[in-house]
Amino acid sequence: MGLWGGRFINESNKLFKEFNRSLSFDYILAEEDVISSVAWSKILMKSKIITEKEQITIESALFELLKEIKENNQKILKSKCEDIHSWIEEKLIQKIGILGKKLHTGRSRNDQITTDLKLWCRKKIHLLLENIIELQKTFILSAESNHNIIMPGYTHLQRAQPITFSYWCLAYVEMFRRDFSRLKDVLKRLNVSPLGSAALSGTAWKINREELALSMGFDSATNNALDTVSDRDYVVELLSSASISMMHLSRFSEDIIFFNSGEADFIELSDTITSGSSLMPQKKNPDALELIRAKCGRVHGSLISILVILKSLPLSYNKDMQEDKEGLFDSIKTWNDCLCMAILVLKNMQIKNESCRKAAEEGYSNATEIADYLVKKGIAFREAHNISGQLVLRAISEKKSLNELKLSVFQMYSNLIKNDIYKNITLESCLEKRMSKGGVAPSQVYEEIIKAKKRLNIF
């Protein structure tokens, strides 16, 4: 059934009809369309546009339809309807006859679709927030159970300074904490109701939009109908949040892929989250992580797409905005899938203590400690930095670690260096001295774990 056509003489071209249809993807909004339609029927009754008996009949039929949708929403795709709105209306009319044609009074598909989309986004945001919390919890528990593992920290993918695996975990807790905060902000701005804005200038019927908004769980109604039906900022914001979080997931994946490689050998991934090679029997591939890394680009592409779609669009609604959904639907599913997979990976990997420590010991990651030691002896940092660099060069030439150099060698570069140099350049000393807020000192890390557990209600 078409929702328009009275002013047309000729029927739409078959190819155009197919090109114009959105049911193949907006069928996902079926439940939301029913929910908003029920709310609309109630406000029509309160405005005395339909009777109480008519409203009860409409609501009953819509909930009956909702039950059918939940049982199998794929059957919607067999229809030739233009979109989900026309499909719902067609089914409603089939159930209750001409009364079903009253439901669209005072409503436009322009405010209807953005209401449905906001309801869908809100539902998905709550699910995403839960999984972001779960991912943070998994990092915290991993940090707590591997608190004593020392490993190299990297800059430019070269060993820089010693850190702990717990500290590495906490870095990602901070990233996903920001993701959580961003997503909550999206929800705050998204949660205003468009319904009742009609096509672009509001409705001529006496509708209490604030009451309507509250009935659907919105905080309030929007303030300007022209802006309301034009607005897809919430889609941009949601995809922006998704893109940033996916970037964090991609960085996490790259770290683990490297840690799992034969070159690092810091961790062992479980058989349950890896795959093999059809040719090379020795291979154990981190496919889950590689897919997360790749899917990041897919989500970023959807963000760019919606920005380009909305660029230069005149007010108010334009058919271009039909293209806001496929990328959004795909990206939100992708983001959620990747969050779940990251949780699974973290729960199914073993940290190799000895390999991590060996790498930290071999990379001259304690060189900064020599410079700091000399500064405490009264040497300017730039000069101390130079002396430390010369000692690293000497150690490399002798194929030794800094700890293995003789005191006499140290004193060739500065007579201020005494026997206490050795206790100052142990890995443990490197960690313990970094007591500044956010530092790697075990006591600081432990304190942050306790704070995070309290914040996330981990008992």
UniProtKB/Swiss-Prot annotation:
One GO cellular component term noted in the UniProt record for this chain: cytosol
Location of the protein in the cell: Cytoplasm
Pathway assigned in UniProt: Amino-acid biosynthesis; L-arginine biosynthesis; L-arginine from L-ornithine and carbamoyl phosphate: step 3/3
InterPro entries: Arg_succ_lyase_C (IPR029419), Argininosuccinate_lyase (IPR009049), Fumarase/histidase_N (IPR024083), Fumarate_lyase_CS (IPR020557), Fumarate_lyase_fam (IPR000362), Fumarate_lyase_N (IPR022761), L-Aspartase-like (IPR008948)
E.C. designation(s): 4.3.2.1
Tree of life domain: Bacteria
Main location: cytoplasm
GO biological process, one term: L-arginine biosynthetic process
Keyword tags: Amino-acid biosynthesis, Arginine biosynthesis, Cytoplasm, Lyase
Enzyme superclass (EC): lyase
Catalytic reaction equation(s): 2-(N(omega)-L-arginino)succinate = fumarate + L-arginine
One Pfam family of this chain: Lyase_1
An MF annotation (GO) of this entry: argininosuccinate lyase activity
Entry's family note: Belongs to the lyase 1 family. Argininosuccinate lyase subfamily.
Official protein name in the record: Argininosuccinate lyase
